[in-house]
């Protein structure tokens, strides 16, 4: 439903922000 879509969108956005933030800190070793 709509709620699931919102959660998915929020997670995607957070993932992008986290990636950008970590990218500015330097690539994490994995």
From Swiss-Prot:
GO biological process: defense response
Tissues expressing the protein: Expressed by the skin glands.
Signal peptide stretch: none
GO cellular component: extracellular region
Entry's localization field: Secreted
Keyword set, alphabetical order: Amphibian defense peptide, Antimicrobial, Secreted
Family listed: Belongs to the frog skin active peptide (FSAP) family. Dermaseptin subfamily.
Record's function text: Has antimicrobial activity.
Protein name: Dermaseptin-3.3TR
Organism in which the protein naturally occurs: Phyllomedusa trinitatis (Trinidad leaf frog)
């Amino acid at each position: 439903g709509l709620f699931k879509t919102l959660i998915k969108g929020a997670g995607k956005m957070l993932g992008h922000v986290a990636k950008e933030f970590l990218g500015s800190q330097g690539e994490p070793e994995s």
